[in-house]
Amino acid sequence: MSRIIMLIPLNKKVSLTTISLSILYFFNKKEQKNCFKSFSYLPLIKSDNINFIRAYFSKKINVLDDINFFKKNFNSDEYSYLLDKIIKECFNKKKINEFILIKGISRKEHDDADQINFDIAQNIDAEVIFIDNLKDFSLGCFKRKERKINVFLQQKKYKNFLGLIFSDINSPFIFNKMKYNFFDKLIILKNTKKNTCIHAIKKNIFFNSFFRVIAFIPWNKKLVKSSVINIFKFLNATLVNTISIKDAFIKNITIFDEDSSVILKKSYANTLVLISSSRMETFFKTLYLVCKSKKIGAILLTGVLKLSENSIKLLKFLTNQGVPVFFIKENTVETLSQLQKFNFNINVQNKYFINKLLEYTSSFFNKNHLISLKKKTTNFYKKTYSPKEFCYRLKILSKSKHKRIILPESYEPRILKAASICHRLGIAECILLGDPKKIYNIANENKIDLNKNIEIKDPILIRDQYVPRLLEIRKNKKIDEIFARKQLKDNVILATLILESGKVDGLVSGTINTTANTIRPALQIIKTDPIYSLVSSIFFILLPNEVLIYGDCAINIEPNSKELAEIAIQSANSAKMFGIEPRIAMLSYSTGFSGTGWQVEKIRDATSIVKSKRPDLLIDGPIQYDAAISKEVAKLKIPYSSILGSANIFIFPDLNSGNITYKAVQRSADLICIGPMLQGLKKPVNDLSRGASVEDIVYTIALTSIQSL
């Protein structure tokens, strides 16, 4: 199984791109033992560097570049579409890649960066590494940063926090409140003493930290350079000659407007020289002498609309000396104004520089911490899923089943829309029960594109063939043929008989019919699975960060201890069917041995029965809801609990408490609840709420398809 690691910046300036590429570089090194064999890289903001990354890391790294959250409003339709796309990509890539690295969004790139990063990490169940900077290596600075991160973790409840990388330590740029322009930065670099690269730090600084420090990377003056190619791409300038500029760097900028004798005394190595096109011929002789005796970094002609023939001849003398020459239509003042906004960027054209940068950065990684990323043990079952991940998993699992699901309420537009979606996505083969002409008219009136390949069964044409079977099944009730024909006018009963015959694999109803009208025919015709003594139900409660299972909230009014135990076992089996590791809480108004009375004893007995029948299941009860879902509360109330505040299946003592709770949670928090899903029948029949949305119906059809064996 693969791992998804997401790098999340906690500040605007943390060298996120460099660290992302350095992690890829670390695992891509041939001599690196225990490295990942194949991995994917997914930046959330599209970058111009993607093609270079592909070329640099060869075919071993699969770079995903069709996702871009830049300027996408949080929770907009575009945002939701991209989030679904990420979930799909991660789900598919996990099958072929051992390691998926996601580069998060910085606050500089998006105002909602913190919320977007959190939302994506939770929905794809990513393990998270925070990237931050440090003013210096002092203990005080580290502790202040530690407190800040601790507050951030309390605000954003990340499930899988792996550790932290500190970058740009001692950088002169990041902690001054001034906003430096490009020229300021060049001056600071010029005046900054050569910094000493610190390869070892007093480790006692990090011993008592509540988080793991994966790397602490000092700022390095030598690696902060402005490449000529990046500057001229930024200015959208035109290159006069064909000289290669991918290795050229600029440390200074000057304007040729002084006396020739003064100009000749200065050094112009690694300097960008700006000359107004109107003064080029005046300075040509001086320029030629400078180029002949000294190295000029590059020349930029400003205010050029079109080069004259004479100018081109003059420039050839300069280019023959190996000096890159560019021109731009903006004048000198406009060009300088633009350059103020330029920032230091990685020169992806210079592979030697990239190698040095990545080698330097990766040398500070705690190799044991990084290699340990490969040691995660996983299995098919997970403790829980995020809502988006769970819904996507429903679609994928149902697609693999290729099941036929009958829908008896085919005159309801929501049902037709859901059937159309299921057909288009391949979730299930939906069978509509009704008059074809009437169904197509309803679809057209509601602008529903109902594919002609969706099968429609006309009940008038098939009812008679199910009369004998209904008489046989209900012979104990001594019904006659007239009564049987009357019952078969109910499409739910007819659909249930079609299911019983094996011509379809499941049934979904309830948008028009009551729960009783959906379930009663199933109990009478399909009947209970021989391994169970009852039929129960569960709801999937889609919380913002996880999916919980509530049972029984729809069928059994006052279950006894044996029935509660069976409901718990059925719910655990259903959870496993969907890849969820069951951890069951048998709910009560008291926890452990704090309460007495027949209601508590019923829960205690039910828990004992489950433990006896299924010792493989994690279960605790009697337990209160807060102790079942909160680790902090569990440590106080029931520290010996086998689930310790991490339950994902909640079994309610009766229908009254279960139904009230699920509806209160759903409505108060505006959540999606999928269900009720029936358990214990020989074949899957599922009920819909009469207020079910099209999305609810689609997911219920998917659930039913997955239940079909």
Swiss-Prot record:
In the N-terminal section; belongs to the CobB/CobQ family. In the C-terminal section; belongs to the phosphate acetyltransferase and butyryltransferase family. It catalyses: acetyl-CoA + phosphate = acetyl phosphate + CoA. The N-terminal region seems to be important for proper quaternary structure. The C-terminal region contains the substrate-binding site. It is found in: Cytoplasm. Pathway: Metabolic intermediate biosynthesis; acetyl-CoA biosynthesis; acetyl-CoA from acetate: step 2/2. Homohexamer. InterPro entries: DRTGG, P-Actrans_bac, P_AcTrfase, P_AcTrfase_dom1, P_AcTrfase_dom2, Phos_Acetyltrans/Butyryltrans, PTA_PTB, Ser_kin/Pase_Hpr-like_N_sf. GO terms for molecular function: phosphate acetyltransferase activity. Its EC number is 2.3.1.8. It is an enzyme of class 2 (transferase). GO terms for cellular component: cytoplasm. The keyword Acyltransferase applies. This is Phosphate acetyltransferase. The keyword Transit peptide does not apply. Involved in acetate metabolism. Residues 389-709 are annotated as: Phosphate acetyltransferase. Keywords: Acyltransferase, Cytoplasm, Transferase. The lineage of its organism: Bacteria, Pseudomonadati, Pseudomonadota, Gammaproteobacteria, Enterobacterales. GO terms for biological process: acetyl-CoA biosynthetic process.
